[in-house]
Amino acid sequence: MPDGIVNLGYGAFEECSSLKSINIPQGITTIESNVFSGCSSLENINIPDNVTSIKENAFRGCMKFQEIKIPETVSSIGNWAFSSCVAIKEINWPDKVKNINDYMFDGCKQLRKVNFPKDLKSIGDSAFGE
């Protein structure tokens, strides 16, 4: 994607099942709802350090993700953001995000390691459910 892009709208790449890799431009500060939802072949994504928010369902159903590197600049992540990402094995949780919302990692059957921040406040309904 060109570096000049400053907005990825709701569902911009939703269900792009052949998409394998993407670099999010530096101008993006929010990953909107459903932007990459259902991108079942997406393996690699580079989230830039200036992203502060990941909305609900942003990566839901990205079944090839094995590891997600969430920048420390992120302060909020919506419900179901990574649900049904069945291959995720490890998550590095940013210190600024104090809540793991409802269904955040629902269906992430391979998840083995989550690095929680010291001051995590809450874990929502079925956050790690099946």
Model-inferred region functions:
Residues 1-7, 17-30, 40-53, 63-76, ...:
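Structural signature of tandem-repeat unit edges
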